[in-house]
Design a protein with these regions (language model features):
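Intrinsically disordered, low-complexity terminal regulatory regions
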Residues: 1-20, 27-31, 58, 66, ...
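PP2C/PPM family metal-dependent serine/threonine protein phosphatase catalytic domain
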Residues: 2-20, 76-81, 111-145
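Beta-strand-turn-beta hairpins that frame and shape the catalytic cleft
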Residues: 3-5, 29-33, 98-102, 149-150
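Acidic loop->beta-strand submotif enriched in PP2C/PPM serine/threonine phosphatases
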Residues: 16-33, 89-91, 125-168
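Glycine-rich phosphate/pyrophosphate-binding loop regions near the starts of catalytic domains
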Residues: 36
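Active-site-proximal, acidic helix/loop segment immediately C-terminal to a metal-coordinating Asp/Glu
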Residues: 43-64, 148, 152-174
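Catalytic core of PPM/PP2C metal-dependent serine/threonine phosphatase domains
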Residues: 48-120, 141
Length: 174
């Protein structure tokens, strides 16, 4: 029996009431589910509006059965069209595909995804260069597929973790 656990933690940024991060979990029509993390450019209300704009497009496409690479490209085109290449958002999709028994990990973000699995996989950082959504006309996602195996863990995060402590000169070595 397959046991899948999801945990989400969200902490407000200092002196800001709203975060630009949006997290959703959606069931896929052909089996499986997708966890989505979108981070809108900047902070505060404007950032939240950007992330919700992208998230609503991503959710609609996933519910229609589109695959993750197509979803990421369409979300990029949508943001690029509506904001004329002037705002960006990062996107991470972690999909459990029950038909192929794989994890499909899709990124348009400078934040890596950590995958830990049983030997021989071990710990891997999926950190190939990826452009954010919305800025450049030909942006493409980075997509990796990993076999589903007992004990596999995936950790994705937004730039709040990656850049924590940087202003105070105490960066984390993520």
């Amino acid at each position: 029996m397959l046991d899948i656990q999801i945990a989400v933690s969200k902490i407000n940024k200092y002196a800001t009431r709203e975060s630009g991060d949006t997290v959703e979990v959606v069931e896929r029509p052909l089996g499986g589910f997708t966890l989505m993390l979108v981070d809108g450019q900047g902070s505060g209300r404007a950032s939240k509006l950007i992330s919700q704009l992208v998230a609503s497009k991503v959710l609609a496409l996933i519910k229609d059965g589109a695959r993750d690479g197509v979803v990421a490209r369409a979300a990029h085109d949508y943001l690029y069209l509506h904001r004329a290449g002037k705002v960006s958002a990062t996107l991470a999709l972690c999909t459990v595909d029950l038909n192929t028994r794989t994890l499909v990990l899709t990124r348009n973000s400078h934040c890596p995804i950590a995958v830990y699995g049983p030997a021989p996989l071990g710990l891997r950082w999926l950190d190939a260069e990826a452009q954010p959504l919305g800025l450049y006309r030909t942006t493409r996602p980075v997509v990796e597929e990993v076999d589903l195996a007992p004990g596999t863990c995936v950790v994705t995060f937004s730039d709040g973790i990656l850049e924590a402590g940087r202003r105070a000169g105490r960066d984390w070595d993520v």
